[in-house]
Regions:
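A short Gly-Trp-Pro
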Residues: 1-10, 15-135
Length: 135
């Protein structure tokens, strides 16, 4: 059985507070896809892939935006209703939750990450040595 580590986090205004049970070595991705870039206005986002039931959060304080992803399956983006900070996305294609890593109070556990760049969708200013992970 894998060791789990409990961490807490919040959005910038503090209305969204959560706790999350992470694997001892969490799966952390830097996603360079067009969808993630447009969602944040940044070159990529850093997310943590969560197991089902790992996130404890008051969903009543979240706003949800739904849209089809590149596969045609639904993506649900969850934001704070007050400050509009992105909190997590649920990707139907993989039945996974991806928590925005920057919301954690303590990021010390996040020691390694993999780039998901969907080949030619990353910014040319980011020199990516690996080909990217197919998930």
């Amino acid at each position: 059985m894998k060791k789990m580590i409990k961490r807490t986090g919040s959005c910038i205004c503090g209305q969204i507070k959560f706790s999350v049970n992470l694997d001892e070595v969490p799966r952390v991705y830097n996603c360079h896809c067009v969808d993630c870039r447009k969602k944040t206005g940044c070159g990529f986002i850093t997310v943590i892939e969560l197991r089902e039931g790992a996130l404890e959060i008051d969903k009543n304080k979240l706003a949800i935006y739904k849209h089809p992803g590149g596969s045609g399956k639904e993506i649900r983006k969850n934001f704070c209703k007050n400050c509009f900070a992105p909190v997590y996305s649920h990707v139907e294609r993989w039945q996974k939750i991806y928590l925005y890593a920057g919301l954690l109070d303590d990021v010390e556990i996040l020691k390694t990450s993999k780039n998901i760049n969907f080949e030619k969708s990353h910014f040319p200013i980011f020199e990516l040595k690996e080909k990217g992970v197919k998930i």
